[in-house]
Design a protein with these regions (language model features):
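Fe-S-dependent hydro-lyases/dehydratases of central metabolism
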Residues: 1-469
Length: 469
């Protein structure tokens, strides 16, 4: 149908059955698992006497709990060691491929699968992780799921789901120098709110989206969930195909040509019907940073913390809570705010282009006195590629630590944590209270280049004022 969106087409192709409840049983083409949300699912499977239905459609890695300073086994943290050992055993017993530490293919699950060509247009992808929407960058429909649903996918390769509405977010114009996909998505969430996408899939489209690289599209789709959307996607195009070609799991030869012509047919048609549409202009977006305790509490780096009068009535209680927790005054400029810790990495911004952008700001400069700054590549492949380019040396010479791959300080499940009231400049995706490991720690979300600028100056700084080396 020319009125069908990509979401409609992919949904229809994966529909196993309509259930009496009105929900759909949806086939899952690719199931990604990791050490945190899979152990209970495997245990439940065993209790039920069930086996993994499609081990060949299941791929595992380890990311959340791994230390980034030394990955020697056994880990100092006994629980982390137990979680990894359990994953290794579950994969071995069930014939599931594990991209483990030192394999050359380990990484944060949402960095690892795309770079190996596992994620492809037209797929349904599920993973027991909130930020599975990342894979929508390829024109896939990708959902984060809970542990009981991980069990269901292992057992049946399908999920019970209700079909979403589709909102197209059309972005005209071009992003200005120093403004990245991270700024764009923070701007979108600021504009539509953290609950604005509830019940929706977001289709990102328009000239500004088409101009994004695949890695930038992954950043954008990664944070669709932070705007309340269940998933976000970009229609596959030549950028998608060029990225996938030659990757280990991508089709090759004649199968490649067939795949590309099939992938092209999936894009939303010119007459596609959307349930809602929002239009934005990329040229008006400044480097954007969160000031509060949700990803929706964002402002341009050249703006001030909003006053209550500038805040919609329903958002005022949260704004007051954020002023108190963050120790900020309404009307206070965000530029110049001192930071303690600078973290570059995560499934949002731990890819090679992110590290290049940050390194271009760090090159020839020095991390400010008293600032702890560190870089955590998103995968072993990203680390190897960055080291081959000498990016690790650029960071080290500037005074950053260069770490081993993992989720690191995005979340408090490994040794990388804030202490006390420390404030971090972070390229990750969530700034909730306590998210980075200290119950009173504070997080400012921003692009990797902005984090690098904060590390060099010791405070929130407009990256556009620091010309790249």
């Amino acid at each position: 149908l020319s009125t069908a969106t990509l979401y409609d087409k992919v949904w229809a192709l994966h529909q196993v059955a309509e259930l009496p409840s009105g929900a759909t049983q949806l086939f899952i083409g690719l199931h990604l698992i990791h050490e945190v949300t899979s152990p209970q699912a495997f245990a439940a499977l065993k209790d039920l006497g069930l086996s993994v239905r499609h081990p060949e459609r299941t791929v595992a890695t380890v990311d959340h709990i791994v230390p980034t300073t030394s990955q020697a086994r056994p880990f100092a943290d006994g629980l982390a060691e137990e979680m990894l050992s359990t994953l290794e055993r579950n994969c071995q017993e069930n014939g599931i491929h594990l991209n483990g530490l030192g394999s050359g293919r380990q990484g944060i699950v949402h960095v690892m699968a795309p770079e190996l060509g596992l994620t492809q247009p037209g797929m349904t992808v599920a993973c027991g992780d909130s930020h599975t929407s990342t894979h929508g960058a390829f024109g896939a429909i990708a959902f984060g799921i809970g542990t009981s649903q991980v069990r269901d996918v292992l057992a049946s390769q399908s999920l019970t789901m209700n079909k979403l509405k589709v909102r197209r977010i059309w972005v005209d114009g071009a992003l200005q120098p120093g403004v990245f996909a991270k700024d764009l998505v923070l701007h979108i969430i600021r504009t539509l709110g953290v609950k604005g996408g509830v019940g929706y899939a977001y289709e990102f489209a328009g000239p500004a989206i088409e101009a994004l690289s695949m890695e930038e599209r992954m950043t954008l789709c990664n944070m669709a969930i932070e705007g309340g959307a269940r998933c976000g996607y970009v229609n596959p195009d030549q950028t998608t195909f060029d990225y996938l070609k030659g990757r280990p799991h991508a089709p090759s030869g004649e199968a490649w040509d067939r795949a590309v012509s099939w992938w092209k047919s999936l894009a939303s048609g010119a007459d596609a019907c959307f349930d809602d549409e929002v239009k934005l202009d990329a040229a008006t977006i400044a480097p954007t940073i969160t000031w509060g305790i949700t990803p929706g509490q964002g402002i341009g780096v050249d703006e001030a913390v909003p006053t209550l009068e500038q805040t919609p009535e329903e958002d005022r209680p949260l704004a007051q809570e954020a002023y108190r927790y963050m120790d900020l005054q309404p009307g206070q400029a965000i530029a110049g705010l001192p930071v303690d810790v600078c973290f570059i990495g995560s499934c949002t911004n731990g890819r090679l282009s992110d590290l290049r952008a940050a390194a271009s700001i760090a090159a020839g400069r020095q991390v400010a006195s008293g600032i702890k700054a560190f870089v955590v590549p998103g995968s072993e492949q990203v680390a190897a590629a960055a080291e081959a380019e000498g990016l690790d040396a650029v960071f080290r010479q500037a005074g950053f630590e260069w770490r081993e791959p993992g989720c690191s300080m995005c979340l408090a499940m490994n040794p990388d944590r804030l202490e006390g009231r420390q404030i971090s400049a972070s390229s990750s995706n969530r700034n909730f209270k306590g998210r980075q490991g200290s119950a009173s720690g504070r997080t400012l979300l921003m692009s990797p280049a902005m984090v690098a600028a904060a590390a060099i100056t010791g405070h929130v700084t407009d990256v556009r004022s620091l010309p790249p080396a």
